[in-house]
Structures are given as structure tokens and as C-alpha cells.
Amino acid sequence: MKALIVITGRGLGGDSVIAYNIIEGLEAKGVQCEIALDESAPGLLFKKKGRTWHKIKIPQAGGHAATKASSVKAAFKMLTATFKARSLIKKLDVDIVVGVIGGGAIVGSVGAKLAGKPGVSIISTPLDSKICPKLNQCYALPEMKYFLPEHLPKNINHTLYPLSEGVGNGNPDIALEKLKESLKFDENKKTILFSSGSSIFKGIIKGANNFAKFSDEYNILLVGLPLKEGYLDDLDENVIYLGYIDWMSHLLTYIDLAVLTDDGVLLEETLASKLPIVTLTKVKWGRYHNMAGVFKGAIIESDIDSLNDNIFRAFDEFDELKKNAVKYAKESLETKSNLAQKIIDVVK
């Protein structure tokens, strides 16, 4: 069996990580995978993994920051993009097309329909959730409003994030040695991670700064690359900025608590590491995803004004939060294989 995976974005962020994990899951079951990225994408994640890809047009469309006007504009770009996708699908003669999030989901879905091939969409945005379910089977990631209701719309089912190999099996000693490289780090203190994923949003910086000013009894870590230049100019001197790291699986086994935005694959990787979480809500474009409702009992959610209090609450309720995180860890780690089988079953 051969599959084409159509991926939105630049080939280096969270969407690409999700796509790569889907590819690994499919290949483990004997499926040959071809990759399609936007022609302008540097594809650094795939390059690092030694992968090649096909270049087509995959407009950024319907992301969480999308407005009605930008979504309409993106829809026109989609029209030409889907015909180019159809040509690639026919040329490769694949058995199934998997579109991953936003523009990737839509281009893959419509392209597959035009080429007369079955498709599966991984959806997570307002626009892909409107278009893709009308054309093929869809799997909604936890941020989607469709994740919790008992009766889902036709063609939409749930999926957790497919996770990378090694998640949940990191080595805390490796993380400790890395952290010791910072003169600010004190291994006798508890350690709290602040992160909004690969890109650092202003809200998570504010949260780290506020807590650093409130207490000096913890190591406060900040991970990621700033979304905009200048975001780190006012970073509190007591915050340890690690930048973008490739040893996150090790770090998650060392730290005592994670303060994350209420979305994204990092949240589930943290749960897979059996670690309690405080989610800082409405950081990314003001959106609210109710992750505490999806992963009940493992997450405390907070706004910026209550964050310091909720961090201390998380330590007070640590044992109960950890017990529930352990419960979700097993399901999270099984998702990659389970989702791959569901995709294969669409063809069968």
C-alpha cells in the first residue's frame, strides 16, 4: 500500500511532527509513504530525518489565527492548489491520501476527491473542520470543539496526538547535565518548565516573568523560539532560557511541573511523561481549547492573573494530578499505532 501525506506549514513545526509520527506509524505497518510540502517550505524536520518530499502549493489556510477575510482569500488559493495535488496523486498512483491540518488537510482532501482516491484528514482548525468532513473520514485533534461531544458530526472521530518514539522514556540524568550548563540552575530546587511549543508566545513569557518575580525557590525554564523579534528583551534575569532544544523527552522526565499553553503536541508529550500540567489559557490568538476537559484530573487550567496561585495548587494536589496523568499516558503512547491502523482500514 502507498500513501501520500500532505502537510501544511514550513516542514519544521508541530504540524510536521504530527505528520512525521503518522508516517512512522504507517511505515511500521508496511505502508510506503510519500510526502508533499508547500513549494516554499524548507522542510528542516524532514531533511534532518533524511527524507525527501514533493513540492506543491499548500496555502496556509484556516489556522487558529485565521479571520473570515483571510479564510476567504485562502479558499481561492486552495482552488489551484488542489488541482496540482490531484496531478501528483495521479502521478504517484497512491492508494490513499492523508492531509494533515489546515491547508494540508484541505488540499489533500479535495485533491484525493478529484483524483478518485480515498482520503483521510487530520483536522484541527475552523476551516478544515468545515470542508474535509464533507469529503472523507476525519480525525479531530484534542483542540477541536468536536472532541468532547457524545454525538459527533458525520465522518468525524477523535484522535489524540500520535507521539514520537522515545516520548515518556527520557533520561533525567541527561537533562540534569544539560541544565547544569546554566549558572542560574540549582539542582537542589524544584524545576518548572514554561513553554508554548516550538514558538514562544508573549503570554507564556509574561507567566514565567510573573512567577520569577513572585518566588526564587524554583528553577524556571523557558523553551522555544520567540514568535517575534524582541519578545525576550524583557525576560526576567532569573528565568533560564534554553531556546529550541532536541532533548525535550529527557527534560520532561526531570522537571517537576510544566506550565504550557492549552493546545499542541507538547501538552500530550508531557502527559505521556506522567507529569502534571498547568495550562495557561487564551495565550495563542485568544483561543480556548478546554484541555482540562479533555484530560480530566491531570491538568489545572489558569488565566494569567491566577497563574502563580494555580502553580502552588498543582504542587499541593501533585499526587492526584500525577495519578491521572499516568492514566492518559498509556492511551497517548498507543495512539500512533492505532491511528495508522484506522487510516489503513479506510482503504480496506
Regions found by a protein language model. Give the residues of each.
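Conserved nucleotide-sugar phosphate-binding/catalytic loop shared by glycosyltransferases and other
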Residues: I5-L12, E24-K77, K84, I240, ...
